[in-house]
Curated annotation (Swiss-Prot):
This is Myrosinase 2. Belongs to the glycosyl hydrolase 1 family. Homodimer. Its EC number is 3.2.1.147. Keywords: Glycoprotein, Glycosidase, Hydrolase.
Length: 140
């Protein structure tokens, strides 16, 4: 489960109004992006992030998320970007068919990059300062 938070005056986390301010694209669109971001976090941390059979919470600062995803985008984009945007993220050179300009980006890579970069933009634009998710593991 995702829980977004924004910093409070006391330095703690409070539930943000992010999900209430995401029109006009609609909540389903952004929920899909957040689910993709969750997959990215699992890609990096996997079972190593959790004690076996116990609920754990992994908290990443926004800068931490940026660090992880920027590295991932660089890895997948390889030489497919020409410059970086104002957040330091690669600007991909995608043709209308959705592939990189040399045809080497497959659909998975394209979707992975698009979802993670859009999720990062979303967090940045909404001033989200941290991302939390909780995973419950059960005995088999």
């Amino acid at each position: 489960d995702f829980m977004f938070g924004t910093s409070t005056a006391s330095g703690g986390l409070a539930p943000s109004g992010v999900m209430n301010s995401l029109e006009p694209k609609g909540l389903a669109y952004y929920n899909n992006l957040l689910n993709e971001l969750l997959k990215v976090l699992f890609t990096y941390f996997g079972d190593r992030a959790y004690a076996p059979n116990s609920p754990q919470r992994l908290s990443l600062s926004l800068s931490g998320v940026f660090h992880l995803l920027r590295g991932t985008a660089d890895f997948y984009a390889l030489n497919h970007y020409s410059s970086r945007d104002k957040y330091g993220l690669p600007k991909l050179l995608l043709t209308e068919d959705g592939y990189g300009d040399d045809g080497q980006l497959d659909d998975f890579e394209k979707n992975y990059l698009n979802a993670t970069l859009q999720a990062m933009y979303l967090m940045k634009e909404q001033n989200v300062t941290s991302v939390h998710y909780t995973v419950n593991k059960c005995m088999n």
